[in-house]
Amino acid sequence: MTLNGWMQIALYGAVVLALVRPLGGYMTRVFDGERTLLSPALAPIERGLYRVSGIDARQEQTWLAYAGAMVLFNVAGFVLLYALLRLQALLPLNPADQAAVAPDLAFNTATSFVTNTNWQSYGGETTLTYLSQMLGLTHQNFVSAASGMAVAVALIRGFARASTKTLGSCWVDMTRATLYVLLPLCTVLALFYVSQGMPQTLSPYVEATTLEGAKQTIAVGPVASQVAIKMLGTNGGGFFNANAAHPFENPTALSNFLQMLSIFVIGAALTNVFGRMVGDERQGWAILTAMGLLFLAGVTVTYWAEANAQGVLSNLGLTGGNMEGKEVRFGIAASALFAVITTAASCGAVNAMHDSFTALGGLIPLLNMQLGEVIIGGVGAGLYGMLVFVVVAIFVAGLMVGRTPEYLGKKIEAREVKMAMLGILCLPLMMLGFTAFATVVPDGLAGPANAGPHGFSEILYAYTSAAANNGSAFGGLTANTLFYNTTLAIGMLVGRFFVKIPVLAIAGSLAAKKRLPASAGTFPTHGGLFVGLLVGVVLIIGGLTFFPALALGPVVEHFAGAAGQTFATGG
């Protein structure tokens, strides 16, 4: 570990914190329907979209109607994307003459991008046309991110409102998230990425002759526009197979820093939106502090593990840390920081190969996802995921002191706790259930490239990533098979919608309740005690659930490596 590495980490944290209040204030005005700096240009477009779509922006929805609209929109998006992938060979903007995507891969890919997971069992430059990348994937990157933001805002309204049945309009919230937040920021980001050397073209792939006289095909395309929303919307799916490790997808150290910043900025700012909308910014800062503590712990362990490379590498006398699978232009610090950011925020983009990390270095990205992607998390999804843990933490605190649990003046009763636990427990069911299944059937065992505990970790990481809607992978797993394409897609769907719908049910229940005045016995939820309780609940409920599985994978791999034991390649 070096001073330069810690300075990079400190600078990143400082810039994120500096952007929380300005962006949080702006998004609060957007979702409250107030005038913003961009309103003169965008308000007419917004009204035009409502008029064309037949939407009454003043008509609000109950939680059930809100959930129904969201599910309907996502089903329509899935059907259109699946059709586009299956028919891409017949459609224009196919300069590389790509064939139609196979049915099981198209099902997996459509599910992946609709659920904001962006798991990729394919290489983008060898599988998809420009039209599929732009109209299919980039479009879903925008609307899946907007969908997560809309659900988060609906839950915030549940806490902020009283004695009402409505949570706002799903259509209006998604439109405003896309039009006022995502599109303007992505326009600026895409232009910046082009200035750094990122391609943005519809020209065919370039044929080049190497110094040895061999022919080489250099893939290009509309990269910058997709990368902008891939990071900002915490989607993560790469235009190229190497993702952000590819020089065309992440050309410079500056583009790398901005991509990391893009991943966290909206999720962090949404905590400020929460504080503003409930009338007490301290509530948002408390939640952000809990997220920050978990993030800092993860960065510290990962950076230490990769910089020291304990185990087999140190036994071989290597002293420069673990550089396998990392870009020399980024180094260990930026690679470790990126890995923790992308798995804390359910993004899944990578600038280094997580499969090549040390056992402990790979454990932290895995644990980040298993905690429920609540350390900043995906845009919207991170906040509503953490608020689900807040409900459980408040319930636990109430049990300990013998009082009816309250949060922001709302009683936390059996219905809210049941919905919260449904949202929490569906993730380990998918992650651990499918992992166990894959380790006892031939189709599952054929996937990992490594034997022993690391092979198990490759399977566990895949299903964890899918259910957590992250999308990153231990690349040694051969996932483009009927078995993995199908089971991973099921995990993505359950991980997305079996969390979203209970969250909206909680929002509807809370919005209908009266607000109780604070009393001397009210548990303060903006101080250090609450932050500690929240972190403890996240670690106990999220972490301990997965400890046996982690012990079979990265933990035993670490101790085996320290003893000099290696395992043969092959499943």
Swiss-Prot record:
The chain crosses the membrane at residues 5-25, 64-84, 136-156, 179-199, 220-240, 254-274, 285-305, 330-350, 375-395, 421-441, 488-508, 527-547. Signal peptide: none annotated. One of its GO terms (molecular function) is potassium ion binding. Keywords: Cell inner membrane, Cell membrane, Ion transport, Membrane, Potassium, Potassium transport, Transmembrane, Transmembrane helix, Transport. It is found in: Cell inner membrane. InterPro entries: KdpA (IPR004623). It is a multi-pass membrane protein. Disulfide bonds: none annotated. GO terms for cellular component: plasma membrane. Its main location: membrane. The system is composed of three essential subunits: KdpA, KdpB and KdpC. Belongs to the KdpA family. Part of the high-affinity ATP-driven potassium transport (or Kdp) system, which catalyzes the hydrolysis of ATP coupled with the electrogenic transport of potassium into the cytoplasm. This subunit binds the periplasmic potassium ions and delivers the ions to the membrane domain of KdpB through an intramembrane tunnel. This is Potassium-transporting ATPase potassium-binding subunit.
